[in-house]
Structure formats: structure tokens, C-alpha cells
Amino acid sequence: MSKHKHEWTESVANSGPASILSYCASSILMTVTNKFVVNLDNFNMNFVMLFVQSLVCTVTLCILRIVGVANFRSLNRTDVKNWFPISLLLVLMIYTSLKSLQYLAVPIYTIFKNLTIILIAYGEVLFFGGKVTSMELTSFIMMVLSSVVATWGDQQAIAIKASSLEDLDQELVESTIFVLNPGYLWMFTNCISSALFVLIMRKRIRLTNFKDYDTMFYNNVLALPLLLVFSFIMEDWSTKNLSVNLSADSLAAMVISGLMSVGISYCSGWCVRVTSSTTYSMVGALNKLPIALAGLVFFDAPKNFLSFFSIFLGFLSGLLYAVAKQKKIQQQKVLAATLEK
């Protein structure tokens, strides 16, 4: 009985679909919790929130280790030296994402964020070998196209609202914003740091033979000093601002979001380990679709043909990518069987 239970546990632990579903569920929960925290009145200390999340995650892991549920490597100089660049990239990725959203509209942000998928796909070719099939590339293009269509829908809604301002030269304003808006520079940095984070983490996992809990522990514990330093440099630590941001409600919400981060930290490392970094990134992009649908239903988001069509394109690109991956796996199995003969 225990043997069958052990085999079943091992099967789930190495299951791609199980890791993807768990990652999707945990990331949706994490998104909802984070949205609640940052929407608190006058909340402006994002790095403190991320610090609390990492701290709660680290403490939770230590407790799980004491009770015998989790097992991970203790901190040592070699692993810290090897993993520190990944933690630095993680902090850079989070910060540039926040700065991009500060200057860019969400649809524009999504367009450039989805370009990261293509960067990762070709980065995998350089790091790990293999190739990107034409079907995979088509799915990537469709994903970006869905974001472009969403932007058109958003701009269409804005144009209708601003139709009364007939004397305003919209093309001149938009072209000026594109040239002067620093959000595009932040977004470019975010795409590069996001791709490097996923690719280097996967390579380090292979080289160090890190397990899921090892990845989870090192990602969080090494991020703690970085997040605190970034917070001291970039955020307002005045007594007045601290009293607003560190109220009982905000602290409770941050602790809850930290517990949610335990799930997303574990599932992120699990998904990268048993699938691929491109699959992990693609799943992350597709995971925005339920939130997009919720935005159409519950929030003040554009509700027009282009908005719904962009969501349809997003799901279609996900299906195409899944088919492309299955075909590639089948071809690899056939090739391996041929070589064995």
C-alpha cells in the first residue's frame, strides 16, 4: 500500500499538468490577494509588502522543516554565491514591472510582457539546445496579437469617451507620449530581466540539483536584504507614511499575501523543473485570461467586439501551443526510438 502511495506521490511530483494547474491556481490567488493589499487606502510601500511576503514564506518554510514536512539545503557560501544573481534578477523584475505599470496602460504593458515569451523560447535554444517549431512561433505571435487587439479595443473605448474633445490633436499627443514616456524603457528592462530570471533559474536548478523547496527557500531568503535596501532607497519611511502603510489591516493583509506567496513560490519552481521555462512563461501569460474575463464582467473595462476577440485569440494561441508541444514530444520519442535501433 505504502509502495503504491509513494509511486503515486512521485508521479504527481513529476507531473507537468499537475504543476501547471497548481501554478495557475496559486498565481490567481496571489494576484487577487496582492490586488487587495495595493488597493488599500494610500498604500505606497510595495517593496515592504514584497519583503513581508518573502519573510512569511521563509518563516513558513522553516516551520515546515522543523515539523518534518519540508526538507531543503541550509544556507552555504557556494549556493548563496550561485543563487544571488537570480534573487537580484527577481527584485529587478518586480521593480521594473511596477515602474512599467506606473507609466503604461495595462494593455500596452501586456503586449510587451508577452514578448518575453519569445525571448525565453529563443533563449532556451541558446542555453539548452533544441529549436522553436513554426507552430510554436505561430502561437507566440497569436499571443502578442491578442494583446494588440485588446489595445485597439481599449483605445476604441477611450476614443468614444474623448469624442467631445474634437479640438485635440490625438495623433500628435500619442506620438509625443510614445517618445517621452519612460515606461517603454522600464518595460524593455522588465522583458530582459524576466527572461534572464527564468532561464538562469532553470540552468542553476540543473547545475545545483536544487529541489523545489531549495529553490523556494533561496529565492525568498536572498531577496530579503535586497528588498529592504530597495525599500529604504526608494520608498518613504517617514513616521506619517509608516503609520498609514503599516496599519493593522494592511499588516494582516500582507501576512495573508505572504502565506499565498508560499504557494506561488513552490509552484513556480515545480513548474519550471518538470516542464520548461517557455511553458512556464506561456502558462503565466495565459493565466491573465481569467483575470481579463473578470475585468470585463466585474470591472470598468472596455466591453466591445475587440475586447472579446482578444480573449478568444489568447485561448486559441494556448491551444495551438499545447498541440505544438505534444507534436514535438512525439517527434522526440520517435527519434529516440530510431536511434536505439
UniProtKB/Swiss-Prot annotation:
Disulfide bonds: none annotated. It is found in: Golgi apparatus membrane; Cytoplasmic vesicle membrane; Endoplasmic reticulum membrane. GO terms for cellular component: cytoplasmic vesicle membrane; endoplasmic reticulum membrane; Golgi membrane. Keywords: Cytoplasmic vesicle, Endoplasmic reticulum, Glycoprotein, Golgi apparatus, Membrane, Sugar transport, Transmembrane, Transmembrane helix, Transport. InterPro entries: TPT_transporter. Residues 1-11, 68-85, 129-139, 198-214, 273-278, 325-341 are cytoplasmic. The keyword Endoplasmic reticulum applies. It comes from the Eukaryota. This is Probable GDP-mannose transporter 2. It comes from Saccharomyces cerevisiae (strain Lalvin EC1118 / Prise de mousse) (Baker's yeast). The lineage of its organism: Eukaryota, Fungi, Dikarya, Ascomycota, Saccharomycotina.
